[in-house]
Regions:
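Extracytoplasmic/secreted envelope proteins and their assembly/folding machinery
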Residues: 37, 41, 112-115, 229-236, ...
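Acidic/His/Gly-enriched intrinsically disordered linker/tail segments
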Residues: 226-293
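Acidic/His-rich structured neighborhood in mature extracellular/periplasmic domains
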Residues: 83-256, 331-335
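C-terminal soluble interaction/assembly domains
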Residues: 276-347
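Sec-dependent signal peptide recognition
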Residues: 4-10
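Sec-exported extracytoplasmic/periplasmic mature domains
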Residues: 45, 64, 119-123, 236-244, ...
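N-terminal mature-domain "stem" immediately C-terminal to a signal peptide or N-terminal signal-anchor/transmembrane
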Residues: 20-91
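C-terminal motif of bacterial Sec signal peptides marking the signal peptidase cleavage site
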Residues: 16-18
């Protein structure tokens, strides 16, 4: 028994070491980042709704730049009756969120570390002045994607704030996520399995990457779009070097291993069966869109959204061939140039 325990411990040590064995992780310990967290979620759901006028006025004094956009744009209400209705409907969701996020320090610490890497690579970039945890409506995954240029993220950036939508991070086994209505109308199980705290920093960094280098790939052909998305993933990897790739990609560990083991076959299939320069929306959705798997590949092992992963590998190859380029220069390189100079030929 002792030998078995020792063996398990050794495997654990090796696994942990392998996650932190990257040579390209810079030392950011001297970079000062302190994020201000203002608990809008608590202020809103702990207000006295019997005196709604007074409560809303107090909230508006405390959050003058945020309350109106939250109510009108995010929640979609314009009067006190609508506010009360939203309050009653989502108060149980808020109560559930407090069991996990009453202490927000673990999330704050994750974000501060990520922003240290952001500041290392982009010293002039200023993190949001305040982090605002919220509990908002359970919009559909399609609505969320429209808000984020095609990428699902429930979070949002304002002029001086970053909103974290806690209703989408209550744990994959949260009872509401398992209901038929939620699965069919909000997020299927392959997506809600990522509704965990560990994914918050990765999904926030998607917003930051897009804030730094807005994704303009919507009208591009397939291969260029894959590479543009891959550039975003490459940059997120720079911001989260200590985070496992399964978190950054949203793939399961099994799906990630399948990609790594079949990289050459994936690329061969795509160049053989697809026009890399097509703008056909169905083809693009096959490789860029969310899904339980990618059509044409293993339903048991392949992930959806496979195109950005291939794009990421192409960008990594290009970056390795161009060590003189800084991250900002790589991000500003056209996908055509990246494809040409990467000389991507996986085995």
């Amino acid at each position: 028994m002792a030998m078995k325990k020792s063996g398990l411990l050794l495997l654990l040590v090796i696994a942990v070491a392998s996650c932190n064995n990257r040579k390209d992780i810079p030392d950011v310990s001297d970079i000062k980042v302190i994020l201000a967290v203002n608990r809008f979620d608590q202020a809103f759901f702990e207000m006295d709704t019997t005196g709604i006028d007074k409560s809303i006025n107090e909230l508006n004094r405390k959050y003058p730049e945020f309350l109106a956009p939250f109510l009108q744009t995010i929640v979609g209400v314009n009067d006190h009756a609508g506010i009360k209705s939203f309050f009653r409907l989502y108060k149980p969701i808020f109560d559930s969120s407090q069991k996990i996020y009453k202490n927000f320090d673990p999330v704050k610490n994750d974000l501060e570390q990520a922003f240290r890497y952001v500041k290392f690579y982009f010293p002039s970039y200023n993190p949001p002045a305040q982090i605002l945890p919220v509990v908002g409506p359970m919009n559909s995954i399609e609505d969320m994607a429209k808000m984020a240029n095609g990428d699902f993220t429930p979070n949002f950036i304002g002029p001086d704030f970053l909103g974290i939508s806690l209703q989408f991070y209550l744990g994959k086994d949260f009872s509401l996520y398992k209901t038929e209505y939620f699965i069919n109308n909000v997020a299927p199980l392959y997506r809600s399995r990522r509704f965990e705290r560990e994914y918050i920093a990765a999904e926030v960094m998607k917003l930051i990457a897009d804030d730094l280098f807005p994704d303009k790939s919507n009208t591009m052909p397939l291969i260029e779009r894959m590479i543009e998305k891959g550039k975003q993933w490459w940059l997120i990897d720079k911001f989260l070097p200590e985070t496992h790739d399964s978190i950054k990609t949203g793939y399961t560990q099994k799906q990630l291993e399948w990609c790594e083991e079949n990289e050459g076959l994936i690329w061969s299939y795509i160049i053989k069966n697809e026009n890399l320069h097509t703008v056909d929306p169905v083809t693009i959705q096959t490789y860029i869109g969310e899904g339980p798997f990618t059509q044409g590949f293993s339903q048991e092992s392949s992930p959806g959204n496979l195109g950005p992963w291939i794009g990421w590998q192409i960008v990594k190859k290009f970056a390795a061939n161009s060590p003189e380029l800084k991250p900002g220069e790589i991000m500003n390189t056209s996908p055509k140039q990246i494809l040409e100079q990467a000389k991507y030929k996986p085995k």
